[in-house]
Amino acid sequence: MTPSNYQRTRWLTLIGTIITQFALGSVYTWSLFNGALSAKLDAPVSQVAFSFGLLSLGLAISSSVAGKLQERFGVKRVTMASGILLGLGFFLTAHSDNLMMLWLSAGVLVGLADGAGYLLTLSNCVKWFPERKGLISAFAIGSYGLGSLGFKFIDTQLLETVGLEKTFVIWGAIALLMIVFGATLMKDAPKQEVKTSNGVVEKDYTLAESMRKPQYWMLAVMFLTACMSGLYVIGVAKDIAQSLAHLDVVSAANAVTVISIANLSGRLVLGILSDKIARIRVITIGQVISLVGMAALLFAPLNAVTFFAAIACVAFNFGGTITVFPSLVSEFFGLNNLAKNYGVIYLGFGIGSICGSIIASLFGGFYVTFYVIFALLILSLALSTTIRQPEQKMLREAHGSL
């Protein structure tokens, strides 16, 4: 590939990834539909909302096998299939007449489709820009976050004008077309050459090799903690506002806007910063910010200002962590197997999405979950300040040996 073609191909891949990520991020408008689906199915909102928990779990599971899918079929085909399955999932959701069908379509099918496209396109795009990994992650994951904001207005307008069932059909069609079009612009990133620095081989670890390193599980704990704290607070922010900060319904609803802005800010600020300083130090900064926010929720007298500041801190770290982590994992274990190595760590997203709710349901209230998250943040902070990269292999001068 000539230098000019290489540049053109990677920038087209970036554009396709941004379009695809924007459409995939639309699933985070799900809370808009809980009330209408509850009325349609004559089921409690909590049972309807469980479909989003299944979606998050399915997303994490399919992300963990995205690397193997890319190896066999290529990024373009897998992304197109992801878009088609996502559109099908929304179509089936529109025609769901019971909870089980809703859970299978909106939860399992949409989640699996979304996860396959999300991590695959992200890791492939990062490989095209090894010199700007943080910035490219910020662009890609930032567009995923913007998708929830953009489709919030689209879906709200559709609900008001065409009703619930047609909204799902149109939403699915728009997402399908965007993802398939984005996929046509993408190409698989070339395999990265093994680099050497001062006689040291920068090794590309396979998944099996990575999982034998303690650093892999240290990173996994940090990622799980950020996801658990962010997803739990995002899920119950409105309830915390009313129960603990004693805000009225209108003021409490502003928590969604605050979280969206903080989440996106974390993705952009920490993502760009990760190209300037050591990425693990960026994770440490995010952990400190989240720790301050969680401490405020636990120990500070909550009013509108302290509450919004606290949840903003947690959401900022969550957005920043999921942006920086793909590049961080590639820094520790190499770029060539990033989709596989990050895919297993990304299971922490699915596990974290349900852990907070399980703890809260077992012990009642918010505070026990907050204390668990607070303790995990302290542990994660200790890990991020002590972790070191795996030892690399030294090149020997002797002929034919390493």
UniProtKB/Swiss-Prot annotation:
It is found in: Cell inner membrane. InterPro entries: MFS, MFS_dom, MFS_trans_sf, Oxa_For_antiport_fam_transptr, Proton-linked_MCT. Keywords: Cell inner membrane, Cell membrane, Membrane, Transmembrane, Transmembrane helix, Transport. One of its GO terms (cellular component) is plasma membrane. GO terms for biological process: cellular response to nutrient levels. Residues 35-43, 96-99, 155-168, 237-250, 303-306, 365-367 are periplasmic. It comes from the Bacteria. PROSITE patterns: MFS (PS50850). Pfam families: MFS_1 (PF07690). Residues 1-11, 67-72, 123-134, 187-216, 274-279, 330-341, 388-402 are cytoplasmic. One of its GO terms (molecular function) is transmembrane transporter activity. Induction: Induced by the two-component regulatory system YpdA/YpdB in response to pyruvate. Regulated at post-transcriptional level by CsrA. Part of a nutrient-sensing regulatory network composed of the two-component regulatory systems BtsS/BtsR and YpdA/YpdB, and their respective target proteins, BtsT and YhjX. Belongs to the major facilitator superfamily. This is Uncharacterized MFS-type transporter YhjX. It comes from Escherichia coli (strain K12). The gene is yhjX.
